[in-house]
Amino acid sequence: MFDVNLFDELRIGLATAEDIRRWSKGEVKKPETINYRTLKPEKDGLFCERIFGPTRDWECACGKYKRVRYKGIICERCGVEVTKSKVRRERMGHIELAAPVTHIWYFKGVPSRLGYLLDLAPKDLERIIYFAANIITSVDEEARHNDQSTLEAEMLLEKKDVEDDVEAEIAERAAKLEQDLAELEAAGAKADARRKVQNAADKEMQHIRERGEREVARLDEIWNTFIKLAPKQMIIDETIYEELVDRYEDYFTGGMGAEAIQTLIRNFDLEAEAEELKEIINNGKGQKKMRALKRLKVVAAFLRSGNDPAGMVLDAIPVIPPELRPMVQLDGGRFATSDLNDLYRRVINRNNRLKRMIDLGAPEIIVNNEKRMLQESVDALFDNGRRGRPVTGPGNRPLKSLSDLLKGKQGRFRQNLLGKRVDYSGRSVIIVGPQLKLHECGLPKLMALELFKPFVMKRLVENDYAQNIKSAKRMVERQRPEVWDVLEEAISEHPVMLNRAPTLHRLGIQAFEPKLVEGKAIQLHPLACEAFNADFDGDQMAVHLPLSAEAQAEARVLMLASNNILSPASGKPLAMPRLDMVTGLYYLTMDKGEDEIGGEGRYQPATEDRPEQGVYSSYAEAIMARDRGVLGLQAPIKVRISHLRPPSDIEAEQFPDGWQKGQAWLAETTLGRIMFNDLLPWNYPYLEGVMVRKGGAGNKMLLGDVINDLAAKYPMITVAQVLDKMKDAGFYWATRSGVTITMHDVLVLPNKTEVLESYEKEAERIERKYWEQGALTERERYDRLVELWKDATDTVGNAVEEMYPDDNPIPMIVKSGAAGNMRQIWTLAGMKGMVVNSKGDYITRPIKTSFREGLSVLEYFNNSHGSRKGLADTALRTADSGYLTRRLVDVAQDVIVREEDCGTRQGVRVPLGIEVAPGSYDLHELWETSASGRVVANDVKDENGEVIAEAGTDLTEELSRTIVNAGVLEIKVRSVLTCQTPAGVCAKCYGKSMASGQLVDIGEAVGIVAAQSIGEPGTQLTMRTFHQGGVGGDITGGLPRVQELFEARNPKNRAPIASVDGTVSLSDEGNFWTLTITPDDGSDNVVYEKLSKRQGLAQVRRPMESNPDAMIERSLRDGDHVSTGDRLMRGAPDPHDVLEVLGRRGVEKHLIDEVQAVYRAQGVAIHDKHIEIIIRQMLRRGTVIDAGTTDLLPGNLIDLSEAKQVNAAQVAEGGQPAQLRSEIMGITKASLATESWLSAASFQETTRVLTDAAINKRSDQLIGLKENVIIGKLIPAGTGISRYRNISVKPTEAARNAAYSIPTYGDSIYGDDGFGEFTGASVPLEEDYTF
């Protein structure tokens, strides 16, 4: 086998018959496969050993030569080469066709390449190929011109002969008539009889005359056709063509079928045709010019690539190796065979029959019919079903052709090349492993033994437990006791990778240190669940084993769970306490103000009678008080603390030089909060507040913010240790808090019936107005009832909320953010409220009961509509979201960080801060998703002109606050949208990696990270289109809206946008508006006609007439002023319009804002840079308007960076540069237009992409990831980029000793908190290790 690393590009082209014969090891002449008795391949058949190689290693077919010593010998008896049977996967054969056939891809594909080349309509081409019409292939015009007068004279003579014959025949008939009449008269016949004879004779003479005229007309037609005969002329009438051949075969050639096409192609002058087409393009217009452009594309492709167009017509077809179309014996003695064998057999059968008929000299009509059948059988082999009805096998199933083997999810590309099943893997159900550290997982003993079998066997032999590998294998299979000890050794410090399907983002596969566990289930760390989106209700996970030292090192350094705490999409922590852990930490840090034990130990200020109570000299004393039973966790106390850093305000006040460990300070806190702070690093400022997961206000603190802050200030290993401590503490205190839910914890509102009475009356009033008085429309009734019952639900819900005491477990679970929300408590204890039907509209009767009371039958029925719709929606959404992710990955897969800095000074402006009060500033609400993690593009100066931030500085939160406090609210930052790196992006334009908080590494596959970050939350987005109540129809939202934006589609309710600044005037045209903008600059008015009133005019913010300081939202009116790019109607603008009016930057901003609006509505945080990467790919190409003196074709799409280089070269040579128009392409179109044909073919429309690539002889430079995965090369990302290849690292002795000296944390009340012998820290190397 050849080495994939030996080449840097892959080219595809058209194979000629010579190429096919050169690849082939022999001709397949018989349709036989294998002998049913001997089960040996038939000679010259589809499995022939002489052609394809031996079926058994080192053995010829007849058995004369056996064993490897005869390697390379060709047996003189059977003709089989003695070699490995593996060659049957590589060796090809061929079938010599008795008549040429066209390749169906090139004639039937859209557009028809053969049709464009020969300037024939596909319909005509089909007639010729399938023997329904003749075509003239060449005309000897000179000979025809020279002999024309002679031939004409001959034709006139022939016509005269015909006329003379007719006259003679008529005269003869007239004479016979005379004779007949005379005889009748002599016999005394009546006048009637004479008239009959006369009429019959007249009729007959008329027929003779007409026949003569027809014959003359036919001769005229033949002559006129011959005189005008030109190449590529089609003659459908078979008789005329035969006459032409009989009379004038020396002056022209013609024919039907692929032979005629082949002759035309061989006579075709590509260069002359190209010149002619260029002439038409330069001077022509309209349809003619468009067709010439399309034809020139095909002609130029053949000229440029050097492909021989004759390759589109085949004289021989290849037969793929037999191992790729196997035939296997089933249990019952029958055979299962690949469909290809059936298709090949049809071809061979028809080909052999055609040969026989030609040899026998069969009539032409029979031969042509056989040729047509041969053409059809080759079509079926190449692409079954492309033309006409597909060839079917048993059970009416269409047979899978060569094209079908490549296409679709089950095709070669997606099934076997982009995703393979691998060895050293297993899968099992997952269960929770609360005792594990973050970097560990529990691996069942049996599974581990099977996975690590080779390693265990090797060690058994090394440690002298077994003599050889065979006995070691037996020991492992019998599970001897010593095997387990050796297994422990084998798995130590050998990470495994866990994966849960669907792998929606890169954290769906992470590395863990295995720990052996009993049972058969994999144990997963509770904090890793969020990233995997795993729960323990029967989920399964797959285990993979990294084998090589490099793979293990990467798994450990890059993929270990404790190194992947932050989300690559937003930079927020994913490994965060949740559910029970949150409840535990909430319980631990609550401040009851009252002591749950008895009150003696809590803090009480001094009174006249007694001194201060509840003041402790140390944390230890407070714990002792708790052990004695006088102090509760949540009681307020005062305590002297010296082992934890004070909060920043106390530190600033009491320790102006900075606090040192051991210095004491007095804290007013609770014992639980000290315990919580004990979990954090000792030098982290003391946190005084209740820990919650969401809804942090007042003295509540968000756990996420704490972990975010830790991740920013401490190394990952410290954060991982803290998270593990939090997990242990969370579970420990959740257990001890006794928080559970029982039915009795659900308190029912006692006065609900009275509360609902008034609403019932109001509902009756609305119904009466509609039914009896007719005072309301159907829509008004619906809106009022919905509003009324929503208000009722809120009233009941709020009453329920107030009724619950703080220590009730249900509000505790909700308020801590562990699970659920208040709305769910309302449905449990208040009322369910309004529910939707299957269309998504509200049912106007609410569900008045709660789940605690139970629903009535009707209520249950009403409720089931919405529930079912929810389930159906989720299923559809999952599929749609997966497809969106796939398209995003495909469009961005080749965006990799290629260099440190592209050197551009360009950037985009982002909002940094807002003025909250005069002179007081704060960070902008969108700072986290737009400005954070960027690099400053230009020097930022304050109002005095002093530089606050230099260009190239990382924009941290601290620096952002400094800039904002200086009054600078918007700055220019580097962005991938303005990056000048040709293929990929540079690190400075990308900024920080959200997952690490550091500047992104060179080689990072940021395109795929972006696609996953956008696609992964896709399932959370809704499928609903939002109703606008009356006007304007529906607004598309959720997932459909995101798809609409990324596909750059014309939106459903398209809103026109103002193309100039100016004043609006409206004129009413019945159902439509006509809107005119009078531009401010005095240019011509811009008129927008037929604007639907149903859609409604755009909403604008304008000052109130009564109070100009206040702003209101109202519809656009006569006399309003609009700016360029403003919407004129409700709905969404078309991205193509935005690009035209506002330019490239305008459409970039529009798309980012619109996509973010959808995700923010669902509470999903995604950084703008991910969306920017996709948009950059959508805007990468432009259309050539004027080619100048370049070789580009007008109307062609071309990469803008490539066009830049071409233009620069032209200008340097003194030529005219090409002019381009920016284009916005949807992600599907952009994926298919990629430079890499391998990537495009594996995405969609495989046959079309391959057809196009072959004609253009496209070379794949193997720049992206997909193309390298397909051919099995190391991907050019991460550690696979060229700069990291062939590195050898040898650690020094000191480095070896220091390899795992790692900080561990001391014991605490939660048991051993040491991180185990391995924690995931990377090996420190000496300074001189430069890569």
Swiss-Prot record:
A GO BP entry: DNA-templated transcription
Cofactor note text: Binds 1 Mg(2+) ion per subunit.
Residues annotated for Mg(2+) binding in this entry: D535, D537, D539
Keyword Transcription: yes
GO molecular function: DNA binding; DNA-directed RNA polymerase activity; magnesium ion binding; zinc ion binding
Keyword check for Thylakoid: no
Catalysed reaction, written as an equation: RNA(n) + a ribonucleoside 5'-triphosphate = RNA(n+1) + diphosphate
SUPFAM superfamilies documented for this protein: beta and beta-prime subunits of DNA dependent RNA-polymerase (SSF64484)
InterPro entries in the cross-refs: DNA-dir_RpoC_beta_prime, DNA-dir_RpoC_beta_prime_bact, RNA_pol_asu, RNA_pol_N, RNA_pol_Rpb1_1, RNA_pol_Rpb1_3, RNA_pol_Rpb1_3_sf, RNA_pol_Rpb1_4
EC number: 2.7.7.6
Cofactor: Mg(2+); Zn(2+)
The entry's keywords: DNA-directed RNA polymerase, Magnesium, Metal-binding, Nucleotidyltransferase, Transcription, Transferase, Zinc
Binding site residues for Zn(2+) 2: C902, C979, C986, C989
Pfam families: RNA_pol_Rpb1_1 (PF04997), RNA_pol_Rpb1_2 (PF00623), RNA_pol_Rpb1_3 (PF04983), RNA_pol_Rpb1_4 (PF05000), RNA_pol_Rpb1_5 (PF04998)
CDD domains: RNAP_beta'_C (cd02655), RNAP_beta'_N (cd01609)
Gene Ontology cellular-component annotations: DNA-directed RNA polymerase complex
Sequence positions that bind Zn(2+) 1: C60, C62, C75, C78
Protein purpose: DNA-dependent RNA polymerase catalyzes the transcription of DNA into RNA using the four ribonucleoside triphosphates as substrates.
Sequence similarity: Belongs to the RNA polymerase beta' chain family.
Subunit structure: The RNAP catalytic core consists of 2 alpha, 1 beta, 1 beta' and 1 omega subunit. When a sigma factor is associated with the core the holoenzyme is formed, which can initiate transcription.
This protein's name: DNA-directed RNA polymerase subunit beta'
Species in which this protein is naturally found: Corynebacterium aurimucosum (strain ATCC 700975 / DSM 44827 / CIP 107346 / CN-1) (Corynebacterium nigricans)
Gene name of the encoded protein: rpoC
